[in-house]
């Protein structure tokens, strides 16, 4: 009579491997059970998700610019239509100009300029913390590169 393992074409499991797997599962369960459901939002990987919309107060306070003379030749980067003289355009902090009917729907979905990706503040505290962490890491990397560059000069 063939053994169970021969009959099912498998190998007996390694008890040590099984113990490690069970320990990892128990660790994951205990961590998950101690997490508050609000903390689960902190697990979001913002580098692979769309950023939240721009803060409503920031969007409302964006400067409105009246198009004058030479600016009338400029085009809205979203719809590619030229601005009319005396028309009011919204100016982003990066100084790009847009028709309000073009940029307002965009900013209601994401917080960045469609041209240069300049980011406006959001109402999402988790995302803002992610932005601050990302900026700190970039500053740290920059200081480290400068330190390495200055080491032998």
UniProtKB/Swiss-Prot annotation:
Posttranslational modification: Autoubiquitinated as part of the enzymatic reaction.
Q: In which pathway does it act?
A: Protein modification; protein ubiquitination
Return the InterPro entries for the record: Znf_RING (IPR001841), Znf_RING/FYVE/PHD (IPR013083)
Q: Which SUPFAM superfamilies match?
A: RING/U-box
Q: Where are the zinc fingers (RING-type)?
A: 76-117
**Molecular function terms from GO:** ubiquitin protein ligase activity; ubiquitin-protein transferase activity; zinc ion binding
Summarize tissue expression: Widely expressed, with highest levels in liver and heart and lowest levels in brain and skeletal muscle. Expressed in platelets (at protein level).
Catalyzed reactions per annotation: S-ubiquitinyl-[E2 ubiquitin-conjugating enzyme]-L-cysteine + [acceptor protein]-L-lysine = [E2 ubiquitin-conjugating enzyme]-L-cysteine + N(6)-ubiquitinyl-[acceptor protein]-L-lysine
What does the UniProt keyword field contain? Metal-binding, Phosphoprotein, Transferase, Ubl conjugation, Ubl conjugation pathway, Zinc, Zinc-finger
Which is one Gene Ontology cellular component term of this protein?
A: cytoplasm
Region listing for Disordered, in residue ranges? 127-153
Q: EC?
A: 2.3.2.27
Annotated positions of the Phosphothreonine modification: 153
Task: Give the signal peptide, or none.
Answer: none
Query: What biological process terms from GO does the record include?
Result: protein autoubiquitination; protein ubiquitination
Enzyme class, spelled out? transferase
As for family, the record states: Belongs to the RNF181 family.
Q: What does this protein do?
A: E3 ubiquitin-protein ligase which accepts ubiquitin from an E2 ubiquitin-conjugating enzyme in the form of a thioester and then directly transfers the ubiquitin to targeted substrates. Catalyzes monoubiquitination of 26S proteasome subunit PSMC2/RPT1.
Q: What binding partners and quaternary form does the record give?
A: Directly interacts with ITGA2B and, as a result, with integrin ITGA2B/ITGB3. There is no evidence that integrin ITGA2B/ITGB3 is an endogenous substrate for RNF181-directed ubiquitination.
Protein name in UniProt: E3 ubiquitin-protein ligase RNF181
